């Protein structure tokens, strides 16, 4: 097993607390690499007794020993990047260790407007996008009309590409009564943005391959969660990129297989926006209690998250398709004082138990959960430092998870701070 490479991924619908473990483990690595997604997924990190909320810059930015890389698989909004750089610097955090791929596709303001318009036109069938332009930018990428960071530095090249890109978009904007975009105005704005981000821009493919050849330690930071993966998630209620298998194509680092994959699992389930959610808690008072105690509101959208019981049937599927080798359990402290804790161990439809994860969204929406009920615990666990000192029923809960998934739990998080993390298994 190559211990120099670690991938950290969310194992549910996002918002699992990945950023905490990137921050926690960053001291052991030379490079922290974001390889997919955009500024649609926020991550929260508590550093130096301050809470930071970022959408684009990787969590490793708080450790000056790390080289923090936004690789080519990311779609980049330069406005967000500059806002976060300013935000970090104003709080005493250096961004001298930040590197941005010149191959990143750029999110323009017309992508954001297209995102909003398409969602509006769907009416009651809207997916619940964050309206950050992610989908339209990825659409341009696969349609071969996308504009990359390297295109921002030559005004004439940039203008020509924007003119080509807006030919069809402006027709659609006009058709649906929206404002059309002036290519020259857009080119001028984004050329200037390009000059501002230029100090961070580098050929990250060469940078990462050089690091790999020198046996530097590299941590890959995933965004969103596997059940939002465009191929393996609850399509179409998913993000626009692959959460799992994009490391090689999203970084340019030809790795046959990363053997060490840390899956971050929330002790219960949450989901933002529309889409099937089999283990959703129907008792609104209990869902409200967990939502408030766990501060379950979107980092980017501020929308209240839907609350559900831990879905082990779903997680078994996630482990199968992702190759997760170890687990970090987060927000276990939120479940303190919940007397009876349900875990979903299977799905049934028409009273028939399923032995597979349905691909059809229509079938999934008709599924009912099969629950096992476990005893809860009343103790406050937020100050406990040793696994042995955790309440017996909490340890039984974790053992149940391990036995069901056949994957070891390595970390147990009992609070948001870095020091509120128990190492169960070295």
Curated annotation (Swiss-Prot):
Mg(2+) binds at residues 15, 42. GTP binds at residues 14-20, 42-44, 305, 331-333, 413-415. Substrate binds at residues 299-305. The active site is at 15 (proton acceptor), 43 (proton donor). PROSITE patterns: ADENYLOSUCCIN_SYN_1, ADENYLOSUCCIN_SYN_2. It catalyses: IMP + L-aspartate + GTP = N(6)-(1,2-dicarboxyethyl)-AMP + GDP + phosphate + 2 H(+). Its main location: cytoplasm. It is found in: Cytoplasm. It comes from the Bacteria. NCBIfam families: PRK01117.1, purA. Belongs to the adenylosuccinate synthetase family. This is Adenylosuccinate synthetase. It comes from Malacoplasma penetrans (strain HF-2).
